[in-house]
Amino acid sequence: MSQKRKLLPAALGLLSLASLSVTAADTLSLQGKTIGVAVVGTQHFWDREAFKGATEEVEKLGGKVIGVDGGRDNQVHANNHDILLSRKVDAVISILGDSAVEPKFKALRDAGIPVFTVDHVSQYSVNNTTSDNYTLGSTIGRYMADELGGKGNVAVFNAFSSALRICGIRYDQWKYVLKDYPDIHIIQPELAEQFANSP
């Protein structure tokens, strides 16, 4: 059998799969479904845009959204998941949060409600969508070091590295890269904004 004849069935199979994927995407619908969208707070641009993007996508797919905002208080954010559980939503998208949400995620899962997380790794989540925080931190470190020509003093605003895993990863990777630049010094003490219920 010639090489062309061997490749033809494979090519036709891939073409069929591709057309099925397009058809499935065209008919994807949340019609008749209610999706809870919980965010730790909408005070920050990224958080607000993630919340907005999630709610708009659910609505675009025909679903109804029940949105809850924790007002930047992790306990309020966690408790908001009880509201979604009592409303018997079909699924929950949860954006950020700390360990206080874990028992809430478990309760949702036990009730048969899937939880999808954003920037929060959880054993109870079906899926976690997150940035590559390791690459972000190291890239920022290399970029900054290059821009400084490998020497200088740096003031660091480090409010959340111990409170938010994603910030901690970025900070740790940034600092790790700086080990290769002994002439770059971090001004002490590091700057940090302190406020109630941070982050």
How would you describe each model-predicted region?
Residues 3, 24-199:
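A residue-level marker of the well-folded mature domains of exported/periplasmic proteins
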Residues 2-23:
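Gram-negative bacterial Sec-dependent N-terminal signal peptides
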